[in-house]
Each structure stands twice: as C-alpha cells, then as structure tokens.
Amino acid sequence: MLFRSVRTAAPIVPRQNRSFPGAWLLSGKNGMTIELECEALLLFYETHHLPEYGACRITVDGEPLNPPVLHSNSIYGWGNARFVAAVPPGSRKLHTVTLEPTEGSFYVLGLGIC
C-alpha cells in the first residue's frame, strides 16, 4: 500500500464510538480526496437516525460508486459504523477516491486498506 495523499479541509471531531474515537466531518464544501495505491479499500462511516446525518457522493477513478450516494441517516442507525467497499478487491493500482457531501453531516470513521 502506498498513500499518495489525503486532501480535505474537514475537521477531525471526537466520536463516542470506542472503536473509532475520531472522525472526519464532511459537510458543505468540506469534501475529501484520497490518492493511494491499493488492491482494495473499505470506507467506514457512521450512521444515525438523527436528522443532521446526511449523504455523500463517492467516485473512484472518476466513476460513481454503485450506489453513487451513501446515506448516513437511517432509521436503523444508532451511532454505529457501516462500511462500503470503495475499491473492491482486484489488482493493485493507483486509485483516486473522491467524497463530496450532498446534504447534512457525513462522518468518515476510517479506511481499511489492502
């Protein structure tokens, strides 16, 4: 794995999840771009039923993820972590992952890299 960069103006804020004590808070124009060489990438995010939890559009190498928008507001959310395979397992290569918040607050808890 080779990290090239993580570019964001999003603040890191404390969370009450013991496994993920801090998170990047994506909202408004504070998105995130990750450049790395990997075989697979998991993106962990927080879900909750509170109305301020929003959504985030994700593209990988310029192509929308399927589904293209992750919703962190869920009637089943209670501050728990969920994940999405932003880069599904495959051959190792350089990837650019872009996260653009579309509404509300979106908390990125961590990255799983292989």
For the regions a language model picked out, list residue spans one by one.
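Extracellular glycan-recognition surfaces and repeat-rich motifs
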Residues: V6-Q16
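Short beta-strands within extracellular/lumenal beta-sheet-rich domains
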Residues: R15-L36, P51-C56, N80-V84
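Beta-strand-rich ligand-recognition modules
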Residues: E46-C114
